[in-house]
């Protein structure tokens, strides 16, 4: 509408946006949902699947999982069914070990989710991962450093906290720092909290 100022348009867009922002990683869209359950209306974006590898695995075990990933790729009712992401967890503090596993995962051609709490390991992993990545590792304790790493690399940032209240506070701080490209982990420490 030509009569609205840019500020008014921005405010209107923010107020009418879906409660869950759409995040794009590679060719895939996450979020953008306006309902919690499919029977309420419909889910906007399909569920995406990942295979998990970890620095705690032997190299042979990780290589086998990544090789088997390529076997799950078929078409059903006109829709391609395959594993879209590789989830790469870091359980060590050695950036070189993590970067090597990330390099193997990136070679599959799938988008990556990098679970990493250490800033130096995250930097090493992002150097070999490419752009289609979710850096999953911001917490109330390290969100400033992880936000800087994610913004520099131009990737989505995953945010964790022990409680919903802490998660809310951390997200508010990240948004105030200019990052709205976030994926939130609302999983609690126990099933009851989730």
Which role does the model predict for each range below?
Residues 33-37, 97, 170:
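Short amphipathic beta-strand starts and helix->beta connectors
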Residues 90-130, 142-146:
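N-terminal active-site wall of soluble small-molecule enzyme domains
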Residues 141-194:
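Catalytic alpha/beta core domains of metabolic enzymes, predominantly
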Residues 41-44, 66-81, 102-107, 126-130, ...:
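Acidic (Asp/Glu)-rich catalytic clusters
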Residues 3-67:
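N-terminal amphipathic alpha-helix/helix-capping segment at the start of soluble metabolic enzymes
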Residues 2-8, 53-61, 80-103, 110:
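Glycine-rich, proline-tolerant flexible connector loops at the mouths of alpha/beta enzymes
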Residues 59-73, 95-101, 166-169, 193-194:
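Well-ordered, non-membrane alpha-helical segments in soluble/globular domains
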Residues 47-55, 81-90, 110-115, 133-137, ...:
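Hydrophobic faces of well-ordered beta-strands that scaffold small-molecule active sites
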């Amino acid at each position: 509408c030509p009569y609205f100022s840019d500020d008014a348009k921005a405010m209107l867009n923010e107020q009418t946006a879906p409660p869950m922002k759409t995040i794009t990683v590679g060719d895939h869209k996450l979020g953008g949902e306006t309902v919690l359950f499919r029977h309420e209306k419909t889910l906007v974006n399909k569920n995406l699947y990942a295979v998990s590898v970890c620095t705690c695995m032997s190299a042979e075990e990780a290589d086998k999982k990544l090789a088997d990933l390529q076997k799950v790729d078929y078409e059903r009712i006109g829709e391609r069914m395959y594993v879209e992401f590789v989830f790469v967890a870091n359980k060590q503090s050695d950036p070189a070990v993590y970067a090597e596993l990330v390099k193997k995962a990136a070679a599959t051609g799938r988008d990556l989710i990098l679970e990493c709490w250490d800033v130096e390991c995250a930097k090493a992993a992002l150097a070999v991962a490419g752009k289609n990545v979710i850096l999953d590792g911001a917490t109330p304790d390290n969100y400033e450093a992880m936000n800087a790493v994610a913004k520099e690399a131009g990737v989505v940032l995953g945010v964790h906290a022990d409680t919903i209240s802490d998660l809310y506070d951390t997200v508010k701080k990240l948004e105030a720092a200019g990052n709205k490209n976030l994926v939130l982990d609302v999983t609690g420490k126990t099933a009851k909290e989730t």
